[in-house]
From Swiss-Prot:
<dbReference type="InterPro" id="IPR031310">
    <property type="entry name" value="Ribosomal_uL5_N"/>
</dbReference>
<comment type="subunit">
    <text>Part of the 50S ribosomal subunit; part of the 5S rRNA/L5/L18/L25 subcomplex. Contacts the 5S rRNA and the P site tRNA. Forms a bridge to the 30S subunit in the 70S ribosome.</text>
</comment>
<keyword id="KW-0820">tRNA-binding</keyword>
<dbReference type="Pfam" id="PF00673">
    <property type="entry name" value="Ribosomal_L5_C"/>
</dbReference>
<keyword id="KW-0689">Ribosomal protein</keyword>
<keyword id="KW-0694">RNA-binding</keyword>
<dbReference type="InterPro" id="IPR002132">
    <property type="entry name" value="Ribosomal_uL5"/>
</dbReference>
<dbReference type="GO" id="GO:1990904">
    <property type="term" value="C:ribonucleoprotein complex"/>
</dbReference>
<dbReference type="InterPro" id="IPR031309">
    <property type="entry name" value="Ribosomal_uL5_C"/>
</dbReference>
<keyword id="KW-0699">rRNA-binding</keyword>
<dbReference type="InterPro" id="IPR020930">
    <property type="entry name" value="Ribosomal_uL5_bac-type"/>
</dbReference>
<protein>
    <recommendedName>
        <fullName>Large ribosomal subunit protein uL5</fullName>
    </recommendedName>
</protein>
<dbReference type="GO" id="GO:0006412">
    <property type="term" value="P:translation"/>
</dbReference>
<keyword id="KW-0687">Ribonucleoprotein</keyword>
<dbReference type="GO" id="GO:0019843">
    <property type="term" value="F:rRNA binding"/>
</dbReference>
<dbReference type="GO" id="GO:0000049">
    <property type="term" value="F:tRNA binding"/>
</dbReference>
<comment type="similarity">
    <text>Belongs to the universal ribosomal protein uL5 family.</text>
</comment>
């Protein structure tokens, strides 16, 4: 079992229960899922770019990504409905906890010119979204085998009712928020 999951159960739950005066431990916010999304608009011209993005996301998440397709045709972008334009992975359970641990301890500190994550990236319902400009911050990606530096979106979905609760939950995991 992931160390972060044990830490959540043993310490974070009690900490948040006293802070927000919850009646039951089931009211304490928890992380439901983590979604990784990589948009590859250039895949329209070169199909190999999408395959490389899928390989990168597989290495980062440990799970095979779902290829996302365009929902509708947009003439300005020269895409048609059904064209593959990206890939995404939804992590739950043990893989989610292991990824979160790697993200906090290894990947985020490797971001270039890192001064902390913005606390303004909450959506109003306690979910947190962040963008990563380079996939090479993850140790699973071999820098020499990267054909192109790609970014990805990371969304952490929680059961928190407000941004304050969501931020308290992530701060309890030592998320490096900007002061």
């Amino acid at each position: 079992m992931a160390k972060l999951h044990d830490y959540y159960r043993d310490q974070v739950v009690n900490e948040l229960k006293t802070k927000f005066n919850y009646a039951s431990v089931m009211q304490v916010p928890r992380i439901e899922k983590i979604t990784l999304n990589m948009g590859v608009g250039e895949a329209l011209t070169d199909k190999k770019l999408l395959d490389n993005a899928v390989a990168d996301l597989t290495a980062i998440s440990g799970q095979k990504p779902l290829i996302t397709k365009a929902r509708k045709s947009v003439a300005g972008f020269k895409i048609r409905q059904g064209y593959p334009i990206g890939c995404k992975v939804t992590l739950r359970g043990e893989r989610m906890w292991e990824f979160l641990e790697r993200l906090i301890t290894i990947a985020v500190p490797r971001i270039r010119d890192f001064r902390g994550l913005s606390a303004k990236s909450f959506d109003g319902r306690g979910n947190y979204s962040m963008g990563v400009r380079e996939q090479i911050i993850f140790p699973e990606i071999d820098y020499d085998k990267v054909d192109r530096v790609r970014g990805l979106d990371i969304t952490i979905t929680t059961t928190a009712k407000s941004d304050e609760e969501g931020q308290a939950l992530l701060a309890a995991f030592n998320f490096p928020f900007r002061k």
